[in-house]
Amino acid sequence: RGIGIGSAGLPSYNILLEGHSDALENDVVIYIKQAQTPAVSRHVTDPGIREYFLHEGHRTVISQRALQAHADPWLGWTELDGAGQLVAEVSPYAVDLDWGDLDDPEEIAAVVADLGRATASMHSAADDQSGESLVPFSTERAIDAAIAADEEGFAPLLVDFAHGYGARARADHQIFLDLFRNGRIPGL
């Protein structure tokens, strides 16, 4: 299982937890990695939110539990040398999708629709059962109410956002390419 490019260059550890017998089926491998501060959290000004978390490992775990109906049972946090760490299982069942043969627009649309339904289903059942009090209401119901208040405007809003986001991503990529090609990124 990959640990994400945000963790590149940081220490991480894989730990084998031996099960109750010699059978491999009851062994578990967990990883511990340093949790990073997301860019958006630097702009959070509400002291109640900022002070809610012990460290970035704690924030990451609480967020994952709130977003996933069936979070990893080994999901947790700890601290090593004063740095917040994320703890999770290295799943023996996790596999990447093989996108190599997916080139037909109709097949792509069907896969995207299936992935969207799976993601929505996983997320929609999660926040009420997270066991945390940071958000004292059901985000699912709040989102549903916001959409219901202007159902006709929802799809155009998403389309406008997607186009704006795409334009920003392309512009950012162009800036990166210009800097990279002109040797203006130290260390690369």
Task: Show the residue positions of the predicted features.
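Conserved ATP-binding subdomain of kinase catalytic cores across diverse folds
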Residues: R1-L188
